[in-house]
């Protein structure tokens, strides 16, 4: 489990196709202290994707990326030199500065517009329609692994505002109009839907439409 508070930005120095999956090598900055903090078998969130370290050096780690992960995430688009937001799993003593992030990408979004707002920037991101019901105004969403606040929503997109600090600590140089990004919705929204509706969803992508509404939440004592 992660918090979406990015610890460092690494660089994808190698991505090698292996069957339908891939093998990757990620270079890390000295401040990340890879060899000291990462052990073989540990998980490292890389642009929001949970990767298991297979080898670790002073300034790098390697990982195998499964065929499903390649298919379901932006790793299918990545090339050598791609910058990656990195975060190690939280512990019981970790300050939860963001929100609960699992490192399990729910879908791929696309940056539709970037516009300045003083020193900040507004970013509109389109999302797969099946995720819209989990994205709420002033709620949290993980974008490329970073816990960010939703400031506006439409039927198929949402707006983020990145303050100067966020632009500095994230792999913000990746974010351009048309760029694909990994999205993970707040897992609490998914659990709430299941608890309130008592509804079994299909395990595939063709989930039923949600009946979750403001009235349903009130009737079940959540509001």
Q: At which residue positions do the language-model features occur?
A:
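Conserved loop->alpha-helix
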Residues: 1-223
């Amino acid at each position: 489990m992660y918090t979406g508070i990015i610890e460092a930005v690494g660089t994808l120095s190698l991505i090698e196709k292996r069957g339908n999956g891939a093998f990757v090598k990620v270079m890390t900055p000295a401040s990340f202290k890879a060899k000291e903090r990462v052990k073989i078998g540990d998980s490292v969130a890389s642009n929001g994707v949970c990767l298991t370290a297979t080898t670790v050096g002073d300034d790098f780690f390697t990982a195998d990326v499964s065929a499903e992960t390649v298919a379901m995430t932006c790793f299918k688009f990545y090339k050598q030199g791609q910058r990656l937001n990195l975060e190690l799993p939280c512990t019981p003593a970790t300050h939860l500065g963001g929100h609960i992030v699992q490192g399990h990408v729910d879908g791929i979004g696309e940056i539709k517009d970037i516009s300045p707002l003083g020193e900040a920037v507004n970013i509109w991101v389109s999302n797969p329609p099946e995720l819209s019901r989990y994205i709420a105004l002033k709620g949290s969403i993980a974008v490329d692994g970073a816990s960010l606040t939703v400031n506006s929503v439409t039927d198929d997109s949402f707006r983020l505002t990145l303050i100067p600090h966020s632009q500095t600590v994230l792999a913000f140089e990746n974010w351009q109009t048309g760029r694909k990004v990994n999205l993970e919705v707040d897992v609490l929204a998914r659990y709430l839907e299941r608890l309130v509706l008592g509804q079994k969803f299909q395990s595939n992508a063709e989930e039923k439409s949600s009946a979750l509404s403001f009235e349903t939440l009130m009737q079940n004592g959540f509001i």
